[in-house]
UniProtKB/Swiss-Prot annotation:
EF-hand domain segment(s): 63-98, 140-175, 175-207
Gene Ontology MF term list: calcium ion binding; cytoskeletal motor activity; structural constituent of muscle
Function text: Regulatory light chain of myosin. Does not bind calcium.
Gene of this entry: Myl6b
Listed SMART domains: EFh
Record-linked Gene3D superfamilies: EF-hand
Ranges of compositional bias, category Low complexity: 36-50
UniProt source species: Mus musculus
UniProt name for this protein: Myosin light chain 6B
Database matches in CDD domains: EFh (cd00051)
Gene Ontology, cellular component aspect: myosin complex; unconventional myosin complex
Superkingdom of source: Eukaryota
Swiss-Prot/TrEMBL GO biological process terms: muscle contraction; muscle filament sliding; skeletal muscle tissue development
Keywords: Motor protein, Muscle protein, Myosin, Repeat
InterPro entries xref list: CALM/Myosin/TropC-like, EF-hand-dom_pair, EF_hand_dom
Amino acid sequence: MPPKKDAPVKKPAGPSISKPAAKSTPGTPLAKAKAEPAAPQAPAKSQEPPVDLSKVVIEFNKDQLEEFREAFELFDRVGDGKILYSQCGDLMRALGQNPTNAEVLKVLGNPKNEELKSRRVDFETFLPMLQAVAKNRDQGTYEDYLEGLRVFDKEGNGKVMGAELRHVLTTLGEKMTEEEVETVLAGHEDSNGCINYEAFLKHILSL
Protein backbone atom coordinates (compact mmCIF):
# COMPACT_ATOMS: atom_id res chain seq x y z
CA MET A 1 0.00 0.00 0.00
CA PRO A 2 2.76 2.61 0.72
CA PRO A 3 4.09 2.46 -2.86
CA LYS A 4 0.63 3.45 -4.16
CA LYS A 5 0.66 6.56 -1.97
CA ASP A 6 3.88 7.76 -3.62
CA ALA A 7 2.11 8.52 -6.90
CA PRO A 8 -0.14 11.35 -5.59
CA VAL A 9 2.85 12.93 -3.87
CA LYS A 10 4.28 13.79 -7.32
CA LYS A 11 1.16 15.66 -8.48
CA PRO A 12 1.94 19.02 -6.79
CA ALA A 13 5.44 18.93 -8.25
CA GLY A 14 4.18 19.54 -11.81
CA PRO A 15 2.07 22.64 -11.28
CA SER A 16 4.39 24.05 -8.61
CA ILE A 17 7.08 24.44 -11.27
CA SER A 18 4.86 25.78 -14.05
CA LYS A 19 2.89 28.32 -11.98
CA PRO A 20 5.84 30.42 -10.79
CA ALA A 21 7.24 30.38 -14.33
CA ALA A 22 3.99 31.76 -15.72
CA LYS A 23 3.76 34.45 -13.05
CA SER A 24 7.37 35.55 -13.02
CA THR A 25 7.51 37.09 -16.48
CA PRO A 26 4.43 39.32 -16.52
CA GLY A 27 4.15 39.71 -12.74
CA THR A 28 6.13 42.89 -12.19
CA PRO A 29 4.87 45.06 -15.08
CA LEU A 30 1.29 43.92 -14.61
CA ALA A 31 1.39 44.79 -10.93
CA LYS A 32 2.69 48.27 -11.75
CA ALA A 33 0.05 48.77 -14.42
CA LYS A 34 -2.71 48.03 -11.92
CA ALA A 35 -1.19 50.07 -9.13
CA GLU A 36 -0.36 53.17 -11.21
CA PRO A 37 -2.84 54.53 -13.80
CA ALA A 38 0.01 56.42 -15.45
CA ALA A 39 1.81 53.17 -16.30
CA PRO A 40 0.32 52.94 -19.83
CA GLN A 41 2.26 56.10 -20.64
CA ALA A 42 5.55 54.33 -20.03
CA PRO A 43 6.18 53.51 -23.72
CA ALA A 44 5.68 57.16 -24.59
CA LYS A 45 8.31 58.09 -22.01
CA SER A 46 10.98 56.07 -23.77
CA GLN A 47 10.04 57.40 -27.21
CA GLU A 48 9.74 61.05 -26.18
CA PRO A 49 12.37 62.16 -23.67
CA PRO A 50 11.60 65.12 -21.40
CA VAL A 51 12.10 68.60 -22.84
CA ASP A 52 15.43 70.23 -21.95
CA LEU A 53 14.00 73.42 -20.44
CA SER A 54 17.47 74.97 -20.13
CA LYS A 55 17.56 75.30 -23.93
CA VAL A 56 14.13 76.91 -24.27
CA VAL A 57 14.32 80.56 -25.34
CA ILE A 58 11.57 82.74 -23.86
CA GLU A 59 9.90 84.70 -26.68
CA PHE A 60 6.94 86.19 -24.80
CA ASN A 61 6.74 89.98 -24.61
CA LYS A 62 6.54 92.05 -21.42
CA ASP A 63 2.74 92.36 -21.46
CA GLN A 64 2.34 88.61 -21.89
CA LEU A 65 4.73 87.91 -19.03
CA GLU A 66 2.74 90.16 -16.71
CA GLU A 67 -0.50 88.45 -17.73
CA PHE A 68 1.03 85.01 -17.19
CA ARG A 69 2.37 85.96 -13.76
CA GLU A 70 -1.04 87.27 -12.64
CA ALA A 71 -2.71 84.04 -13.76
CA PHE A 72 0.02 81.99 -12.06
CA GLU A 73 -0.63 83.80 -8.77
CA LEU A 74 -4.34 82.96 -9.02
CA PHE A 75 -3.43 79.26 -9.21
CA ASP A 76 -1.09 79.60 -6.21
CA ARG A 77 -3.45 78.43 -3.47
CA VAL A 78 -0.78 78.25 -0.77
CA GLY A 79 0.72 81.69 -1.29
CA ASP A 80 4.34 80.54 -1.56
CA GLY A 81 4.81 81.53 -5.21
CA LYS A 82 4.42 77.96 -6.47
CA ILE A 83 1.75 75.71 -8.01
CA LEU A 84 1.38 71.94 -8.11
CA TYR A 85 2.58 69.98 -11.12
CA SER A 86 -1.02 68.79 -11.52
CA GLN A 87 -2.15 72.41 -12.03
CA CYS A 88 0.28 73.21 -14.85
CA GLY A 89 -1.88 71.79 -17.65
CA ASP A 90 -4.94 73.74 -16.50
CA LEU A 91 -2.93 76.96 -16.23
CA MET A 92 -1.48 76.49 -19.71
CA ARG A 93 -4.99 76.06 -21.11
CA ALA A 94 -6.19 79.12 -19.20
CA LEU A 95 -3.40 81.05 -20.91
CA GLY A 96 -4.61 80.14 -24.40
CA GLN A 97 -2.65 76.96 -25.06
CA ASN A 98 -4.24 73.59 -25.74
CA PRO A 99 -1.66 70.94 -24.84
CA THR A 100 -2.53 67.26 -24.57
CA ASN A 101 -1.90 65.56 -21.23
CA ALA A 102 1.06 63.79 -22.83
CA GLU A 103 2.59 67.13 -23.86
CA VAL A 104 2.16 68.50 -20.35
CA LEU A 105 3.83 65.43 -18.83
CA LYS A 106 6.68 65.76 -21.31
CA VAL A 107 7.57 69.33 -20.32
CA LEU A 108 7.19 68.39 -16.64
CA GLY A 109 9.80 65.66 -17.09
CA ASN A 110 7.40 62.70 -17.18
CA PRO A 111 6.65 62.73 -13.42
CA LYS A 112 4.91 59.89 -11.60
CA ASN A 113 1.35 60.27 -10.34
CA GLU A 114 2.55 60.89 -6.78
CA GLU A 115 4.87 63.65 -8.01
CA LEU A 116 2.05 65.34 -9.91
CA LYS A 117 0.13 65.70 -6.66
CA SER A 118 3.06 66.69 -4.44
CA ARG A 119 5.76 68.49 -6.43
CA ARG A 120 5.50 72.26 -6.89
CA VAL A 121 6.98 74.65 -9.43
CA ASP A 122 7.66 78.40 -9.29
CA PHE A 123 6.85 80.90 -12.05
CA GLU A 124 10.40 81.10 -13.42
CA THR A 125 10.46 77.32 -13.88
CA PHE A 126 6.94 77.20 -15.29
CA LEU A 127 7.65 79.86 -17.95
CA PRO A 128 9.94 77.74 -20.19
CA MET A 129 7.40 74.91 -19.92
CA LEU A 130 4.71 77.23 -21.26
CA GLN A 131 7.04 78.44 -24.02
CA ALA A 132 7.85 74.87 -25.07
CA VAL A 133 4.14 74.03 -25.30
CA ALA A 134 3.45 77.21 -27.31
CA LYS A 135 6.22 76.42 -29.83
CA ASN A 136 5.02 72.84 -30.12
CA ARG A 137 1.53 74.08 -30.96
CA ASP A 138 2.89 76.32 -33.72
CA GLN A 139 4.82 73.40 -35.20
CA GLY A 140 1.73 71.19 -35.03
CA THR A 141 -0.32 73.82 -36.83
CA TYR A 142 2.28 74.00 -39.60
CA GLU A 143 2.33 70.22 -40.04
CA ASP A 144 -1.48 70.08 -40.13
CA TYR A 145 -1.73 72.74 -42.83
CA LEU A 146 1.11 71.17 -44.78
CA GLU A 147 -0.62 67.79 -44.77
CA GLY A 148 -3.85 69.42 -45.95
CA LEU A 149 -2.20 71.20 -48.87
CA ARG A 150 -0.37 68.07 -50.01
CA VAL A 151 -3.77 66.77 -51.12
CA PHE A 152 -3.72 69.39 -53.87
CA ASP A 153 -0.12 68.64 -54.86
CA LYS A 154 -1.04 66.37 -57.76
CA GLU A 155 2.46 66.38 -59.28
CA GLY A 156 4.21 65.76 -55.96
CA ASN A 157 6.61 68.63 -56.61
CA GLY A 158 5.80 70.77 -53.57
CA LYS A 159 3.55 73.12 -55.53
CA VAL A 160 -0.19 73.71 -55.87
CA MET A 161 -2.15 75.73 -58.37
CA GLY A 162 -2.85 79.26 -57.20
CA ALA A 163 -6.48 78.90 -58.28
CA GLU A 164 -6.96 75.86 -56.02
CA LEU A 165 -5.33 77.60 -53.08
CA ARG A 166 -7.57 80.62 -53.60
CA HIS A 167 -10.60 78.33 -53.55
CA VAL A 168 -9.45 76.67 -50.31
CA LEU A 169 -8.78 79.97 -48.55
CA THR A 170 -12.14 81.49 -49.49
CA THR A 171 -14.37 78.47 -48.82
CA LEU A 172 -12.87 76.35 -46.02
CA GLY A 173 -12.25 76.94 -42.31
CA GLU A 174 -11.98 80.58 -41.35
CA LYS A 175 -12.97 81.90 -44.75
CA MET A 176 -10.96 84.80 -46.14
CA THR A 177 -12.23 87.49 -48.48
CA GLU A 178 -10.86 87.64 -52.02
CA GLU A 179 -8.96 90.81 -51.11
CA GLU A 180 -7.31 89.09 -48.14
CA VAL A 181 -6.39 86.11 -50.30
CA GLU A 182 -4.77 88.30 -52.96
CA THR A 183 -2.79 90.06 -50.24
CA VAL A 184 -1.35 86.88 -48.73
CA LEU A 185 -0.67 85.27 -52.12
CA ALA A 186 1.09 88.32 -53.52
CA GLY A 187 4.56 87.38 -54.76
CA HIS A 188 4.13 83.63 -54.23
CA GLU A 189 2.84 82.57 -57.66
CA ASP A 190 5.35 81.64 -60.34
CA SER A 191 4.95 82.20 -64.08
CA ASN A 192 2.84 79.05 -64.35
CA GLY A 193 0.40 80.14 -61.65
CA CYS A 194 1.80 77.63 -59.14
CA ILE A 195 2.73 78.25 -55.50
CA ASN A 196 5.38 76.57 -53.36
CA TYR A 197 3.07 75.80 -50.44
CA GLU A 198 5.79 75.10 -47.87
CA ALA A 199 7.31 78.55 -48.37
CA PHE A 200 3.82 80.05 -48.44
CA LEU A 201 2.86 78.42 -45.12
CA LYS A 202 6.05 79.56 -43.40
CA HIS A 203 5.35 83.09 -44.60
CA ILE A 204 1.74 83.02 -43.35
CA LEU A 205 2.59 81.57 -39.94
CA SER A 206 5.33 84.14 -39.42
CA LEU A 207 2.90 87.06 -39.81
